[in-house]
């Protein structure tokens, strides 16, 4: 696979983390004008952009390999665990010190989160009052559930028609699971139940399925490379559609089955198109070196950005006023965003070098040793 192809995937991750940071900075200013607040809230769907990129890159790696034996599958799990777990566990330690849980330490909550099982109960995410071991950790739990299923899915879903069938099955499964989940959660507060049904894995499965559709669409030789200006025009249309999804409440709730056109699905379709265009015309301003570097650092940035989004207003001595209202709130939002982004990526640069990269190197060593032993036994 060429470097240029990997460049656009890094860029996608860069845009995803900027969307997520924008959303969480926006939540700090509840009195911003409503249309602006709704637009920043759309950054919530940056997680779905991450999920699409994850499915796409895993499929690229899977199809590059010539053999998919037990050693390969074992190596896949080792690589995924050591890619994510070290920074995730470090984040848990950082937040335990920086934002101590009001409810106190809970060994069971920590172990459930460390096992990436935290998206299977409202108390574990939590959407009820409780200790969130790593802010935003729900998406990492969802990602690990996808990892657990990925080898089986990659074996079964081997073409564009099968990917489309997978999406149809995933959508039906999500709707059915959310219907049953709503009944199961009837005793919980409405907000806790609704948030859980958005976060949990069944509601996100169709997004990963769209990642499979995207992979086979990109690999199809029937679609020509786009020219630069047609690509820009197409992306402007995608941006306009995404802004429409963000601004108009007629689209309804966030949970599949809650409306005929849930925004999670509409946003994912828009992001899918965005990635497809970048794959066909990667030499765009949207894949510039800075955004690609942000993509490389995006996981550490995801784990750490809450620290700065929550902390900077406190540390600023009043310069960043989260109680501001109206247009003044917009100015303070811009100020917080403008400081939180570079400080987050400065910290992420260190975390990537000191925590993520050693984990990846350890994975490579373990995989190399396992492969050598398998060859010797053969």
Segments and roles (model prediction):
Residues 20, 199-200, 301:
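A composition/secondary-structure signal for short, hydrophobic, low-basic-content segments
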Residues 25, 64, 220, 304-307:
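N-terminal low-complexity, intrinsically disordered patches enriched in charged
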Residues 57, 114, 213, 270-277:
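Specific aromatic-rich, kink-prone transmembrane helix
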Residues 204, 208, 232-357:
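Alpha-helical transmembrane segments of multi-pass integral membrane proteins
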Residues 30, 222, 311:
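Conserved protein kinase catalytic core
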Residues 149, 156-172, 217, 221-240:
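Hydrophobic alpha-helical segments of polytopic membrane proteins
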Residues 4-7, 35-47, 128-142, 182-210, ...:
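Interfacial loop-to-helix transition and helix-capping segments at the boundaries
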Residues 1-183, 292, 297-298, 316-378:
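Membrane-cytosol interface segments of multi-pass membrane proteins
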């Amino acid at each position: 696979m060429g470097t240029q192809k990997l460049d656009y995937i890094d860029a996608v991750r860069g845009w995803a983390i900027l969307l997520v940071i924008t959303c969480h900075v926006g939540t700090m200013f509840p009195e911003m004008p409503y249309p602006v607040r709704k637009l920043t809230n759309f950054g919530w769907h940056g997680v779905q952009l991450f999920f699409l990129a994850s499915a796409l890159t895993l499929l690229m790696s899977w199809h590059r390999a010539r053999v998919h034996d037990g050693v390969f599958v074992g190596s896949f799990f080792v690589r995924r665990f050591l890619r994510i777990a070290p920074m995730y566990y470090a984040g848990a330690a950082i937040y335990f010190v920086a934002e101590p849980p009001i409810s106190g330490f809970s060994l069971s909550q920590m172990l459930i989160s460390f096992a990436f099982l935290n998206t299977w109960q409202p108390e574990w995410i939590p959407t009820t009052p409780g200790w969130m071991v790593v802010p935003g950790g729900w998406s990492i739990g969802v990602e690990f559930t996808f990892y657990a299923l990925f080898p089986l899915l990659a074996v079964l879903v081997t073409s564009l028609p099968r990917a489309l069938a997978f999406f149809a099955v995933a959508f039906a499964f999500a709707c059915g699971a959310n219907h049953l989940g709503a009944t199961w959660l009837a005793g919980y507060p409405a907000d806790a139940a609704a948030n859980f049904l958005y976060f949990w894995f069944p509601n996100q499965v169709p997004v990963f399925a769209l990642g499979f559709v995207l992979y086979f669409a990109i690999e199809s030789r029937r679609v020509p490379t786009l020219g630069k200006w047609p690509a820009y025009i197409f992306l402007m249309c995608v941006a306009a559609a995404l802004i429409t999804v963000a601004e108009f409440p007629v689209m309804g709730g966030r949970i599949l089955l809650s409306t005929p056109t849930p925004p999670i699905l509409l946003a994912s379709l828009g992001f899918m198109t965005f990635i497809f265009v970048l794959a066909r015309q990667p030499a765009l301003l949207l894949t510039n070196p800075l955004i690609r570097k942000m993509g490389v650092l995006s996981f550490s940035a995801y784990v750490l950005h809450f620290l700065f989004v929550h902390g900077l207003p406190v540390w600023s001595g009043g310069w960043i006023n989260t109680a501001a209202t109206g247009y003044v709130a917009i100015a303070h939002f811009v100020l917080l965003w403008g400081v939180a982004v570079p400080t987050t990526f400065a910290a992420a640069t260190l975390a990537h070098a000191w925590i993520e990269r050693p984990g990846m190197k350890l994975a490579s060593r373990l995989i190399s040793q396992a492969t050598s032993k398998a060859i010797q036994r053969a």
